[in-house]
C-alpha cells in the first residue's frame, strides 16, 4: 500500500459524500481511505458503513467520546500506506492529486510534497512557469519562517515515518500550527508544487484566536533551541500573526492584548522588505499606537 488518505470527521459534515467521491475518483490507484468519525449522527454512521461495505479501499472508524485523541492520530495508527495525506470532510481533491504528489515524492525522494489549495475562487489558469521548488534540510525551516511554506496540514503528502514520535495535540484548535514545524524539523526534502489540487470549503470557524499567539511563543522556544540563526525570522512571523489575529478578534481588550506582541516584535519586521505591502503598512501604523493600527486594520480588511 502506497498511500493512506485520512478523512477526520467531527460532527455532521454535510459535504462528506462529495469529499469521498472526489477521493475515490483518483487516477492513481494504490491507496486506502480511512474515515474517522466523532459524534456522528445516525445518518452519518449509516453512510460511512455503506461506504465501507461497498468499497474495499475504505475503512470506517467510529470514535467514542471517551477516546481523548486527535482524529488524525487515530487515522495514522490505522494507516498502512508508506505515505499519508489528510482531507477535510467538507473539501474535495483534484482527480490527479495523488498522481502529482506521488510523482514528486518519488522523483525527489521527498518526505513532504506540498501543493496549493483554493476556496471559493474559480481557477481560470492552473499553469505556473516555476513548477516546483525543492527545499532541503535547514532550508525547509528557514523558508517556513520566511512564510514561503505554510502551516496547513491539507494539500500535502507525507512520508508516514515522519510521524514517528510526533502526534497532533488532543486539542484540535490550531493542531496543524502546533505540529507542522515539528514535521518540517524532521523533514530532509520538501517539494512545493505550484498547482492548485485541493478545494477547501470556505466556512466560518469558531476559533480561540488568542490561543494561537500562545502557540507562537511555544514555537519561538523551539526555534531558539534548535535554529538560533532563525530567531529573528521567527519574531517577524509572530508579529505578522499578531496583526492578522487582530483582524479576526472582536473584543477590543483582546486586540489590545495582541497589540502587545506587535509592539514586542515589530522592530524585526519594520524593515523586512519581503513582507507584502499591506502587512508592512500595518506594521508601520503600529508605531502610531493601538488606536491607529486598530482603525487601519478595520478599513483595510
Where would I find each of the regions flagged by the language model?
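Short aromatic/hydrophobic "clamp" motif used to bind/position activated sugar donors
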Residues: 84
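Acidic donor-binding segment of Leloir-type glycosyltransferases
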Residues: 20-62
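A conserved hydrophobic helix/loop-capping motif in glycosyltransferases and polysaccharide synthases
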Residues: 2-15, 19, 26, 36
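Cell-envelope/extracellular polymer assembly enzymes that use nucleotide-activated donors
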Residues: 1-4, 32, 178
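Catalytic core of nucleotide-sugar-dependent glycosyltransferases
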Residues: 195-233, 241, 252-269
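Donor-binding/catalytic cores of nucleotide-activated saccharide
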Residues: 68-69, 91-193, 200-208
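Membrane-interface aromatic/basic loop that binds lipid-linked glycans or pyrophosphate carriers
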Residues: 252-301
Amino acid at each position: 500500500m502506497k498511500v493512506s488518505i485520512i478523512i477526520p470527521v467531527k460532527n455532521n459534515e454535510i459535504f462528506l459524500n462529495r469529499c469521498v467521491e472526489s477521493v475515490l475518483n483518483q487516477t492513481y490507484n494504490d491507496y486506502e481511505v480511512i474515515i474517522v468519525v466523532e459524534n456522528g449522527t445516525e445518518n452519518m454512521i449509516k453512510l460511512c458503513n455503506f461506504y465501507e461495505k461497498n468499497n474495499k479501499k475504505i475503512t470506517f472508524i467510529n470514535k467514542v467520546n471517551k477516546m481523548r485523541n486527535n482524529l488524525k492520530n487515530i487515522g495514522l495508527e490505522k494507516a498502512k500506506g508508506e505515505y499519508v495525506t489528510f482531507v477535510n470532510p467538507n473539501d474535495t481533491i483534484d482527480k490527479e492529486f495523488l498522481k502529482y504528489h506521488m510523482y514528486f515524492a518519488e522523483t525527489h525522494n521527498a518526505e513532504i510534497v506540498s501543493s496549493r489549495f483554493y476556496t471559493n475562487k474559480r481557477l481560470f489558469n492552473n499553469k505556473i512557469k516555476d513548477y516546483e521548488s525543492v527545499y532541503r534540510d535547514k532550508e525547509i525551516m528557514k523558508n517556513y519562517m520566511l512564510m514561503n511554506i505554510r502551516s496547513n496540514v491539507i494539500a500535502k503528502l507525507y512520508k508516514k515515518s515522519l510521524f514517528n514520535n510526533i502526534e497532533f495535540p488532543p486539542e484540535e484548535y490550531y493542531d496543524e500550527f502546533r505540529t507542522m514545524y515539528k514535521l518540517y524539523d524532521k523533514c530532509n526534502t520538501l517539494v512545493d508544487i505550484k498547482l492548485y489540487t485541493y478545494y477547501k470549503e470556505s466556512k466560518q470557524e469558531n476559533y480561540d484566536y488568542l490561543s494561537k499567539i500562545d502557540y507562537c511563543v511555544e514555537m519561538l522556544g523551539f526555534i531558539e533551541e534548535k535554529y538560533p540563526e532563525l530567531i529573528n525570522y521567527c519574531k517577524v512571523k509572530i508579529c505578522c500573526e499578531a496583526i492578522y489575529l487582530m483582524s479576526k478578534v472582536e473584543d477590543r481588550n483582546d486586540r489590545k492584548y495582541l497589540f502587545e506582541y506587535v509592539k514586542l516584535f515589530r522592530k524585526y519586521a519594520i524593515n523586512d522588505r519581503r513582507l507584502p505591502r499591506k502587512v508592512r503598512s500595518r506594521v508601520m501604523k503600529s508605531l502610531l499606537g493601538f488606536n491607529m493600527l486598530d482603525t487601519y486594520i478595520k478599513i483595510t480588511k
